[in-house]
Amino acid sequence: ITALERAKQLFELIEEHKDRQYGGYFEAFTDDWKPIDDMRLSDKDANEKKSMNTHLHILEPYTNLLRVWPDEHLKVAQQELITIFLNHILNAETRHLELFFDERWNKKSSIISFGHDIEASWLLYEAAQVLGDSRMIKIVMPVSIEIAMAALEGLESDGSMVYESEFGRKDMDRHWWVQAESIVGFMYAYKNSEN
């Protein structure tokens, strides 16, 4: 079996277990795909059924799979994922991403993750580009710039990006992945806005 065939199988398996009632993907399951009580990836995470992080990390491989396998079912799943970000995960007022949700997409966290904001800004744009839907690209491009602009709230005078914020108090830790995603995210924002 080829690597591409394995990727296709994993895509079908993920899709088989998605939330058909409210859309999106649950955080975790037992080893036999049953509901699990503790869905957290770490002690720091909220024990909620859905997260931005899971959806972001499903969007990324779906985008890359779509590059080599332009399957209609995959295109529909990609479009649904982008729409979930636009309609549920993205805060319409602040342009930051919400982090945790119940199964009906009710917000369950007040933390702002600057690294995930800037990461999502470029991943959403890239996902729309690879999908090749001109209408979706027109919607996502300005939104991706707005998310990058919101992420600027985490930028410090030395050019680094802090980890996160809650109720206006910043966690001043510097994590490598946040700095790396900032390079890519701000590069895309510049390319798309020339600012």
Which ranges hold each PLM region?
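Glycan-recognition and catalytic cores of secretory/periplasmic carbohydrate-active enzymes
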Residues: I1-N195
